Structure formats: structure tokens, C-alpha cells
Amino acid sequence: RRQRQMCIRDRPNVAEAMNLIGDVDGKTAIIIDDMVDTAGTLTAGIKMLKDKGAKAVYASCSHGILSGPAIDRLKAAKLTGFVCTNTIDQTENQKNYPEMTVLSMAPLLAGLIHAVEENSSLSEVLAHAFDD
């Protein structure tokens, strides 16, 4: 059975309403987002999941802008784990939030560039992008 978090918002960086479909009581919740800017919506989702009884909450994003209050909000949210990529340099953010795991996009981008140069399959590169 799937648990799904849904967020409805009218403007960027403003969490207007949050609804949870499914039961997370006593379960591990994982939030996957494309981009985290100020982390307002993300931390509202984390709070909602914890309030509904999630035993652990992990979050990830592919693009961590992490501007303004984002790092302080993530620290205060006491996530079990937070993962993002280095599409934006995260060196300073990692110093301030060492619990954050940053995945390098360099091997994936290098593989894609190589595949284009060799006229080979991009799908094959993507299928094995994070095998390590």
C-alpha cells in the first residue's frame, strides 16, 4: 500500500495547505522533491508526517538551492537524513549542516557526455548512473 504526501500551494516558497493520504503511524517516511529553496514546504511536510506518527523521516531533492532560512529549518526539523545533489555547490551548507549527504553529479554528467560523443545510449548511462 502506498503512502503519498501531497502539497498544494499557490505561490513559490509558501506552503498553503498539506494533506496526507494514507497511514504513516509507526512507519518510515521518505519525501522526494525536485527542488528545495527555503525549505518551508519541505519542513511543513516533515512536521505533518511526524505529527501523524512517522517513526523516521528522510528527505531528498535533486536541486538544493537552500537559500535564506533553509539550513536552519532543516536542522530544526530533525530529519533522520537529508540527501541532495551538488548541482549547486553545497560546501558551505554542509559545514553548517553536516548531517546532509551530498551526491556528486559529475560521474553521471561525464557518462552522458561520453555517450553523446560516442553516439551510444543515454538510457544505458541513466540506467546504471548510481550503481556504486
Across the structure, where does each feature detected by a protein language model lie?
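Generic structural microfeature
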Residues: 1-2, 108
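Short, small-residue-biased leader/transition segments that mark boundaries at the very start
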Residues: 3-8
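PRPP/pyrophosphate-binding module of the type I phosphoribosyltransferase fold
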Residues: 9-97
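Acidic, metal-coordinating catalytic segment for phosphate/diphosphate chemistry
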Residues: 71-132
